[in-house]
């Protein structure tokens, strides 16, 4: 698998064991790898792909996704809201501090493709 050899070359398996709280990888919006440390899950941290977040955490996604910058506010926000695909979903409950980084890797092969991030909840840090 292309991603596995890239992960190995970048030293991700070792970093995941020693210094990352979670790792995700997507190839053209398809999830090829995802993990999160159990202690973060116990604190209520959610780190998954967008499709899983919509299925398993619909209430949180509906509450926040596309709310800070609504699609009607700007043409690029509207475009993003209309055609988004893939992506990582990170939710850190209010007051929780994530001490170890969460790392997402994306490989986009389509020319002109882009990615857009959204940050959720007050007084949370990653």
Predicted stretch roles:
Residues 1-126:
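Glycine-rich and polybasic anion-binding loops at the starts of cofactor/ligand-binding domains
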